[in-house]
Amino acid sequence: CGGIWNLYTLNNGGAFMAPEPDDDDDETWVLFNAMNGNRAEMSPEAAGIAACLMTYSHHACRMENYAMTVHYYRLRDYALQHPECSAIMRIID
């Protein structure tokens, strides 16, 4: 999980970070969520979205932080329109 991560801002005020892809256009990341037992294979961008959604959700619940809740739903709205929506939702479910 090292390397360079890029920050993306969304038109709706949301934001996420994603690992910079290698030169290989077909690069995929395999994520496993031990909390729900789900596994998904996705692009670096989708992996970043999923990782940020899980992080925002964790902090929103644990810290009862309204700002994190807002960030979560802004990014989730974006993720629902993403071409890899199914994989993202499977891993965060």
Protein language model annotation of sequence segments:
Residues 1-26:
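Amphipathic, interaction-prone secondary-structure segments
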Residues 24-93:
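Polybasic, proline/glycine-rich intrinsically disordered low-complexity segments
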